Amino acid sequence: MYTKKFTSMEKSMEEDKRIVKPSSSLIVVIPTILVIIVLWLRNITILDYTHVLLGGTWTGIDLFMGLVISRVMIKMSVGARIEFIRRLVPMMLFFMPTIASLAITAGIYLATYEGIFSLRYPVIILAGIIVLVLVIQGFAIFLPNELRIYFELRKSQPDSKKISRLALINFRLSGVQAAFQFAIIFIMANIANGNLFLKF
């Protein structure tokens, strides 16, 4: 009986030590399936709602990471900081790139369905430039840093300073991305008002 309990505790501890669990795939699969269903329905209202929801989630998380988490992280002890980063890895490695990609995809389809996905509109050009900057930041800096953190955490003796440095870079980058997303929100507001040429 005690052996079974001990084995169960061992398994539980091993599960807890895992950085990425099988359930982590759900934060990629579920949003992706939902967006595919929304695109298949071709309902502009539902697609608009989905785009706003995804974009708002992306902006909110980036803002929280950049303004709050980065400041809290500096005041943490090294051990607490590394454990906190380890817990965040699944979200930062899988959820954030997924939400960002789906928000952009939903936005492109929405603009196409509304007949405004054209380079003759300044709002589309500006939105495209900002999205390009966000994509470059996300997939050329943010994601590679998260992968470095993940592989460093898997080592028998992780480099705490390296992990903290990379995590802080990403948290601060999240704040920068939030600023670009505010610009996107301004553009979206103009599109909603029919001001496609940004006339004031």
Across the structure, where does each feature detected by a protein language model lie?
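Polytopic transmembrane helical bundles with strong interfacial aromatic enrichment
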Residues: 2-200
